A protein has these predicted regions:
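Ubiquitin-like/PB1-type beta-grasp interaction modules and other compact soluble beta-rich domains
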Residues: 1-64
Length: 65
């Protein structure tokens, strides 16, 4: 399916946000995900289905000092 991730079009085979994060090798505990301009809470990653042409913004949390 075609997804727009952080402004870039990608062709990926994933059903849910949790699948997408696995494909992108991202840990759910260190990311924030927006799906079609709606924030998705971590506890819903396993149940939130993706559709063709969905737009996602994925932000990784990085600690520092």
């Amino acid at each position: 399916m075609k997804l727009i991730i952080n402004g870039l079009e990608k062709e990926l085979n994933c059903e849910k946000i949790s699948d997408l994060l696995n494909i992108l090798d991202l840990e759910k505990d260190i990311v924030a995900v927006e799906l079609n301009k709606n924030i998705v809470h971590r506890e819903k990653f396993n149940n939130t289905k993706l559709n063709d042409n969905d737009k996602l913004e994925i932000v990784t949390v990085v600690g520092g000092g």
